[in-house]
Amino acid sequence: MFNFFKKDSNSLLYDTYKPFLFDEKHVWLNSEGWYKLIHYLFDDKIKDEFNLIPIKNGCWADTYNDGRRRVISLFHINTSFATFKWGWNFEYIPHYTSKITWCRTDKSIYTHTFELSPKFINRKGDNYTVFGKFESKYKNNSEGFQKFVSDHLKVWDTLHEAIVEYYNATSTYEKMLNRLEENQKDGYYSFILPTNSIIYAFIKKYVHSIEAEDDFQKILFVDEKVKDAYYKAFSKIKWYSNFNKS
């Protein structure tokens, strides 16, 4: 537990991050300092709670287990503010930009499907679901920086319950498919994650569902080139034999 509220530790923390503060009046970190603070505050929390480790700026993951791994990362609202998102990366599902690419390494990791806190999606005013590089209401001094840090920690406390619920609800492939079905019916997620239908079909193929082919063919791709590229990867999936095991 970080004890930011002792005078000496507050002063030390402020002194550590002072070189990254570039506004004379208010707390405003540059990008390097902000990521440094985020990892200082959250690396241990995420490791202790979910056994995920930092793999790059603003991203934590575990190792592959049954073709997938958990990923918690920053969901950037803009260049200055973010919240957390949490989801899964799949070893056997590619990502398409201008061509099919695989996302199997820490460097290339991609969160295929994820969720955000309902408190963030439906937020009204400041409900501690977002943190940022700067806060104009706090002065650039030890006390102001303490409050800035405290706000970051409150965001984690606000989001924590939803993260736990999500990973419990997607702990098996069967549960994962059920969750994806729910999200495909949700207006918000169908808008920000239209690729959930692709993830759904790929998982069905991986667990050897006889419906996988039909599910894939129902997907509305932007063009045939994209569909063909995905289908090539889809056809090569080796099925998983432990679908019904917890």
Model-predicted regions and their roles:
Residues 2-35, 61-246:
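Intrinsically disordered, low-complexity regulatory regions enriched in serine/threonine/proline
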Residues 57-59:
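Beta-strand-connecting loop/turn residues
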Residues 31-55:
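Amphipathic alpha-helical segments
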